[in-house]
Each structure stands twice: as structure tokens, then as C-alpha cells.
Amino acid sequence: VGKNGWQFEEVYEEIQQKYLQKKVHILGYLSGKSLVNLYNLAEAFVFPSVYEGFGIPPLEAMMCGCPVVASYSSSIPEVVGDSALLIDPKSAESIASAMLKIIKDEELAEKLTNKGLQQAKKFSWEKSSKELLNIFKSL
């Protein structure tokens, strides 16, 4: 889901070469409602980003009650806290292992869902703007 990013062509070529078109769906941009529906249908949200300025997609998934598997790099650990399984974004084994844990362990999936909902409550545009205003006032 989303716009074509870094190394998209290589990933797309790999999908074609390995005949994975029926298993890997490249959806492009989705509207808010469609995205929420997708999060609600998913067993997990996997976000193996190597670089991320903030980490809005994992936060969106947590807000929708979707367990998260995310990269241990960049700002993502700070955003997800202990409410996600953190993985090495360059290791297929690490990603697959975390995905299998969530799929096979309903208790873990439920725990991550509940923690994710709580973690997501810590973030809002209103809260961020108030904190920024307080910083400016203190200068």
C-alpha cells in the first residue's frame, strides 16, 4: 500500500520472476476508509522500513487494532514502544519469524493489539501542537 518507494522496481521484478503476483498485491495509494478496512482485515501489519522520519503507518495500524511487526531502525521503536515485534528490516528470517509468531500465537496477537491501542493514544495532532506551543512559550 502506498506510493512506489525506494527499490520498487527491484521488488516488482522479483515478484514477476518468482510468479508471486497471486500472493503479493501492490495496491498503490488507498483512501482513509479503504486503509482502515485493510488494517481491520489484516492478521498483522509488517513495516520493514530502513529509514522513516516518524512512523505514521505503524501508528495507523495500531489505532485500528492491528498487531504490528516493525523495523528496529530509525524512529520506529520510539513510536511503537513495546507494542510491536521489532525486526531486522534486512533479514527475511527475522521478518518471517515475527509474522509466524503473531499468526500462531493468538494471545500474543491480542496482547500486541491491546498495547498498540494504548500506545496510539499517546499521539495526536492536537497533543503535538500543544507540546510545540509550550516549547515556543518557554523560549
Language model features with spans:
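C-terminal alpha-helical cap of glycosyltransferases
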Residues: L100, W125-L139
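Short glycine-rich donor-binding/catalytic loop of glycosyltransferases
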Residues: V50, M63-V80, P89-A92
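Conserved acidic donor-binding segment of nucleotide-sugar-dependent glycosyltransferases
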Residues: L85-A92, K101-E106
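Acidic donor-binding loop of glycosyltransferase active sites
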Residues: Y29, L38-I56, M63-P67
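Nucleotide-activated donor-binding/catalytic signature segment of Leloir-type glycosyltransferases, i.e.
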Residues: E10-V36
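A short, well-ordered alpha-helix in the C-terminal region of glycosyltransferases
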Residues: S94, L108-K122, K130-N134
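Glycosyltransferase donor-sugar binding loop
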Residues: V1-Y12
